[in-house]
């Protein structure tokens, strides 16, 4: 009976949007199980592959993501919560779209709720937000610092030293960096303590103590600020070279 139902669904030739709705309704886990269950082969695997591919594509559609970012400022808490859930599903594509909105001064009225949504998305936002610290946009940097502090992100610690002590930092960034470090390491370092910490951290990097695990092919992805795109972008480095990049 189930196999006949699968055959009927395949015969309908549902478009990507309809497939996405189907996956949202029954859950992606059902399709992963369907793909692995030999009782329903080959139709089950065919349907599962098509449905999951469509869901992946739809979740990351730029127009859909842009609409979800707009919905973060909807007066309805339930609509905002659903938008955050859908943005989480879209992954890094959504994070970058949200950062682009934070960098847009014309959308300043939306910034607080967008920043809160980034915080609620959790770990996935950390590396792109660290990349934002290379921006020349003080408003964006302040939001990034505040979110990293709220997430209590240890790997952000060395990147917060510069805005804390640089004479070029506006007061707002100095205060934000101090508050973030207080949240992360439960203390605000003196300048001499910070210098000792950075020297020690550089030595650790050269000894191979990298901020993240290398992938199977021996590479590591760093998010760095792209001055032309005015966004953080992922850059893949050989793990052996990352110490030089991070230390710089």
Residue ranges and their predicted role:
Residues 2-5, 9, 18, 95, ...:
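Solenoid-repeat scaffolds in large eukaryotic assemblies
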Residues 25, 29, 193-196, 201-247:
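Short coil/linker segments at helix-helix boundaries
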Residues 34-54, 63, 197-207, 218:
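Intrinsically disordered, low-complexity, charge-biased linker/tail regions
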Residues 4, 43, 63, 78, ...:
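Residues within HEAT/ARM-like alpha-solenoid scaffolds
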Residues 51-63, 67-71, 185-197, 235-237:
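TPR-adjacent "capping" and linker segments in tetratricopeptide-repeat scaffold/adaptor proteins
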Residues 7-11, 21-25, 38-41, 47-59, ...:
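Structural detector for internal amphipathic alpha-helices that build alpha-solenoid repeat scaffolds
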Residues 5-6, 160, 164, 206, ...:
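Inward-facing hydrophobic residues that define packing positions of alpha-helical scaffold repeats
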């Amino acid at each position: 009976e189930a196999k006949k139902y699968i055959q009927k669904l395949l015969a309908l030739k549902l478009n990507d949007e309809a497939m996405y709705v189907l996956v949202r309704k029954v859950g992606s886990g059902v399709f992963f199980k369907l793909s692995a269950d030999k009782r329903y082969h080959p139709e089950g695997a065919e349907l599962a592959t098509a449905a999951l591919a469509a869901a992946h594509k739809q979740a990351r559609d730029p127009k859909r993501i842009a609409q979800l970012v707009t919905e973060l400022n909807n007066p309805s808490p339930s609509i905002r919560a659903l938008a955050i859930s859908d943005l989480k599903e879209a992954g890094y594509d959504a994070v970058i779209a949200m950062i682009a909105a934070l960098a847009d001064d014309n959308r300043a009225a939306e910034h607080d709720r967008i920043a809160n949504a980034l915080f609620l998305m959790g770990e996935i936002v950390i590396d792109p937000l660290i990349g934002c610290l290379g921006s020349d946009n003080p408003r964006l940097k302040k939001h990034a610092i505040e979110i990293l502090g709220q997430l209590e992100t240890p790997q952000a610690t060395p990147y917060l030293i510069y805005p804390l002590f640089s004479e070029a930092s506006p007061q707002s960034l100095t205060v934000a960096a101090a508050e973030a470090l207080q949240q992360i390491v439960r203390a605000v370092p003196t300048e001499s303590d910070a210098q000792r910490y950075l020297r020690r951290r550089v030595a650790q990097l050269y000894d191979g103590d990298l901020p993240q695990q290398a992938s199977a092919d021996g590479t590591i992805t760093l998010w760095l600020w792209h001055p032309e795109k005015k966004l953080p972008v992922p850059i893949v480095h050989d793990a052996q070279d990352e110490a030089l990049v991070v230390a710089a």
